[in-house]
Amino acid sequence: MADKRTEILRAARPILLRDGLGGTTLDRVAAEGGISKMTLYRHFPSKEALFTGLGGYMCECTREGLERAPSADIKKSPANRLADELRVLTSALIEPDWLALYRLLVADGWRFPDLARVFDQSGMRIVRRRIAELLEAGGVAADDSGQVAGEVVALALGDGYQRAILGIVEEGDDVAFAQQIEAAVTHGFSQI
């Protein structure tokens, strides 16, 4: 059974992602989420704290998904493991909830540096580290793997992610992501 904090975040998630920070109040989260105000305020004294908590929670859920990804199969080659990792990552980041969170982060993150920091430290920094480890397993020098990992992530997300953020969905996007991932893997291991 989930702890109370997780229950609150699950209840608040659709409200915050639908209405954003400006359109959300803690009172409405309590009412729509079926949570007592006292419990909500005990765990999250402000909507900014709730938003930051939600960002951390979503990053944690995505990390758990990556840990169960086929890339964990050490019998596969590092290149295949990297491709698997990038497929899971791109699939997660183009989910509607992640796109909504990212849009909110871009719109409001500058006012809430803690949220931006959580997203970076609990999300993308960990992803880059995991990818750097896969690159190192394939022969990329440890001194270079961090930089190359950032490049690999950027290439894998590419134009497809930018279109998804803007709400542009086109036939063939899945093929475009597959091509971007292939190019990212090729780039990553060309740095040996």
PLM regions and their residue ranges:
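Hydrophobic alpha-helical connector segments
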Residues: G53, L66-Y102, S145-V152
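C-terminal alpha-helix
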Residues: I15, L134, Q180-I192
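Short, flexible, glycine-rich and Lys/Arg-enriched loop motifs at helix boundaries
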Residues: Y57-K76, A164-F177
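Short loop-to-helix capping motifs
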Residues: S46, D108-P113, G158
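Generic hydrophobic, amphipathic alpha-helix propensity
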Residues: K4-R13, V29, L54-M58, T62, ...
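Hydrophobic/aromatic-rich alpha-helical bundle segments in the mid-to-C-terminal region
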Residues: E136-A184
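Helix-turn-helix
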Residues: E7, I15-A49, G53
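Amphipathic alpha-helical packing segments from all-alpha helical-bundle domains
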Residues: N80, L93-A100, L104, P113-V140, ...
